[in-house]
Amino acid sequence: MSNGIVIIGSGFAARQLVKNIRKQDATIPLTLIAADSMDEYNKPDLSHVISQGQRADDLTRQTAGEFAEQFNLRLFPHTWVTDIDAEARVVKSQNNQWQYGKLVLATGASAFVPPVPGRELMLTLNSQQEYRACETQLRDARRVLIVGGGLIGSELAMDFCRAGKAVTLIDNAASILASLMPPEVSSRLQHRLTEMGVHLLLKSQLQGLEKTDSGILATLDRQRSIEVDAVIAATGLRPETALARRAGLTINRGVCVDSYLQTSNDDIYALGDCAEINGQVLPFLQPIQLSAMVLAKNLLGNNTPLKLPAMLVKIKTPELPLHLAGETQRQDLRWQINTERQGMVARGVDDADQLRAFVVSEDRMKEAFGLLKTLPM
């Protein structure tokens, strides 16, 4: 292939793609360009760094140099790509440019920070780099406010609480995990967080932040306020699409791709958190792994469509872990909930009594794979 494959990004998606390409072709030129150090780390570990007493550098599994040597790559770390000339098939940075035969965007997603006064005081934990920038403040903080009660917010709330910190979690919704499941299903974890000492401020809104002599004053609705030492935004991710937009690619929530992971330009593909696959943004490990396997084949000329099975999503809250699958967010499902001391099985069924979703917890997570087989594709 003329000029080989250029990949923008160095996270989980990019690395999975490299490994799958190299299983099939040991010599095709591969170039990776990324704004970070390109060291490998396990991103889900960020939800547990405080209770584990880990520093940012402790998360590194493989250095960029070791990665390059193992997989025969050209790496350009700490490099910001400024533009893509799709017609000329050239990627540009301020001081360099790279010709490509095929280009892959694996630019990930950035943490959304609510646009309130004082938003610059909010921290995010979406990368090793972001944790490195704030690890001292988080380790020293006694009082922590987490903004957002979704998957990451719930994981962080439990982790900081396990580390002995006073944790407050605020969310507009009436229950935690509101975008993933109904309150009658999430209530078991919500109760456990409360038992542990997490102060839940649900149906509440953060209105602003202000630095004080003794911490950060968070102003809430209904004339309430709370003083803390650190504020973490856990209000979701936004796919990184700016580069693709400047290149003239079709954008919706993410970079739009088809079942072959191909964008609106025949020579440009997208993978991972930045990609919107046939209308779906899937920022979870399993779909990224499966997508990387398919994309490697497609880049090497073995055109294969992506077919995603029903997949598990894991909520890593060690005191009460959950697995879920299917259309758990559907409003029209009837939930059949079986709760025992050792865990919960919640089944979401439609009007025809067909299983469409499930959530399992604790010791009953072992039932997940059996339930997974009964979900429709």
UniProtKB/Swiss-Prot annotation:
Its cofactor is FAD. Pfam families: Pyr_redox_2, Rbx_binding. One of its GO terms (molecular function) is oxidoreductase activity, acting on iron-sulfur proteins as donors, NAD or NADP as acceptor. InterPro entries: FAD-bd_OxRdtase, FAD/NAD-bd_sf, FAD/NAD-binding_dom, NO_rdtase_NorW, Rbx-bd. The keyword NAD applies. Its EC number is 1.18.1.-. It comes from the Bacteria. It is an enzyme of class 1 (oxidoreductase). Keywords: Cytoplasm, FAD, Flavoprotein, NAD, Oxidoreductase. One of at least two accessory proteins for anaerobic nitric oxide (NO) reductase. Reduces the rubredoxin moiety of NO reductase. HAMAP family: NorW. This is Nitric oxide reductase FlRd-NAD(+) reductase. The lineage of its organism: Bacteria, Pseudomonadati, Pseudomonadota, Gammaproteobacteria, Enterobacterales. The gene is norW.
